[in-house]
Amino acid sequence: MFILNNRKWRKLKRDPSAFFRDSKFNFLRYFSAKKFAKNFKNSSHIHKTNISKAQSNISSTLKQNRKQDMLIPINFFNFEYIVKELNNQNAIGVYILPSNLTLKPALCILESHKEDFLNKFLLTISSENLKLQYKFNGQIKNPKSVNEIWTDLFSIAHVDMKLSTDRTLSSSISQFWFRLEFCKEDKDFILFPTANRYSRKLWKHSIKNNQLFKEGIRNYSEISSLPYEEDHNFDIDLVFTWVNSEDKNWQELYKKYKPDFNSDATSTSRFLSRDELKFALRSWEMNGSFIRKIFIVSNCAPPAWLDLNNPKIQWVYHEEIMPQSALPTFSSHAIETSLHHIPGISNYFIYSNDDFLLTKPLNKDNFFYSNGIAKLRLEAWGNVNGECTEGEPDYLNGARNANTLLEKEFKKFTTKLHTHSPQSMRTDILFEMEKKYPEEFNRTLHNKFRSLDDIAVTGYLYHHYALLSGRALQSSDKTELVQQNHDFKKKLNNVVTLTKERNFDKLPLSVCINDGADSHLNEEWNVQVIKFLETLFPLPSSFEK
């Protein structure tokens, strides 16, 4: 946070016109300085003692930037950022985070605190060099003066606001929307202007227990010391399976065990690495921060860029979850029979390939209901039927074998594959299936490459078993699959455009950059994929050295 020194504070009070004339703060450059200063002076919640205390905590980096009259870059510009800055100004209110992070969070202020809040809000966006827009009478306004803002906001009970900045290193995190609400006070309760996920009416005797609207900007969920019924009180982990075809030890083993015939199961494009894992981890840190721990399952050495000292990362070798009799393996079907044996994994986890990338902010609710029921994203069409046939895709034959087990167990037929997207998994269900189908699990486990008699455990069996046993439900989330035989340039550019626009309604939950059929030999495909990855996720994550 950028903080004004004592000299600048004195100048603001003594000669506000000169302060804004000389200031490099863009936002309030056009505002009525006298009006702002008058309101600022009348605020009883801003004290010089707070200024002095804040100044004593300025970092050495910030001091260096101040000498150059610069503002430091913002790593993560989001609603949490403005709440933190307002708390630094001793603003008072509550905030409400939506269950779906693509919806707007809300910042709720008492009507009686409106004037004080607006002073601190305008001071914050000024000192942080932020740009403000809001929806008013059906139009998006770019206010030019404090008078205009005050006239607009004092006439309404709630407004959708947009804050943006040019201080981020990535355009994809340079803006966000939120709802500003002004609550009315009755002698017995506080009434919010719109419905919210907790309670529109807050009784005064509730406030005695939690001190909401008394100090700071607090989370409205603190209305109770217990978790809300729609909140998740369980951890969720993330699991990747990863291979590096350039790993020398892997190459030697691959040559030793590779069958004489070629198929999709043995194509080297299945094992090509463009450092997709690096970008996948960036996408999860940016859009899926709710994850407790990340397990990466592999029979290769970790990539040089990965920071294994990060407490959130755990590298898992095949021998830690599979018996020696099944190693080495080059079959994803085999590896996927054993993911629930990862030491220390949560009962609830998300299984993802390194070519699955999150495109927008997500939370636990995108993958599990609060009661633990998993959310599935099955394809809209079905194509799993008939008998296993030599020469047909291995994933399809694996699904057919799984379908045979499901028909015997549940007396129903299934046809839909899971989309190419992160999958919501439960270890208790996987253990249950392994116990029920030991022969099929063991046979698939010991196939070194995908084979005709495999079962697709995570690709098909788990999802329909969980669905038919009442422990999973279908989700309507959209996902995107991009392959070289698609109009891939158009698809990739569309995702980039929607991301820059923060158009969460149209953005898919995830995008899969799917290699196959020797796609690594397609130069245009490789160029466009790398460009897409570097455009969407340019900033290093904390998982990188």
Curated annotation (Swiss-Prot):
Quote the EC number.
2.7.-.-
- Per the UniProt entry, what are the Gene Ontology biological process annotations, in alphabetical order? polysaccharide biosynthetic process
Domain of life, per UniProt, equals Bacteria
Q: Any idea which GO molecular function terms this record carries?
A: transferase activity, transferring phosphorus-containing groups
What single Pfam family name could you report for this chain, choosing any that match? Stealth_CR1
Transmembrane intervals: none
Sorted keywords for this record are:
Exopolysaccharide synthesis, Transferase
Which InterPro entries would you find in this protein's record?
Stealth, Stealth_CR1, Stealth_CR2, Stealth_CR3, Stealth_CR4
Q: Which family does it belong to?
A: Belongs to the stealth family.
Give the note: Stealth proteins are part of a protein family that is conserved from bacteria to higher eukaryotes. Family members were first identified in microbes as proteins that help pathogens to elude the host innate immune system. Microbial stealth proteins are involved in the biosynthesis of exopolysaccharides. Stealth proteins are predicted to function as hexose-1-phosphoryltransferases.
Q: What does this protein do?
A: May be the polymerase that links individual UDP-N-acetyl-D-mannosamine monomers. In serotype A the capsule is composed of repeated units of (alpha 1-6)-linked N-acetyl-D-mannosamine-1-phosphate.
This chain's protein is named Capsular polysaccharide phosphotransferase SacB
Species source reads Neisseria meningitidis serogroup A
Quote the gene name from the UniProt entry.
Answer: sacB
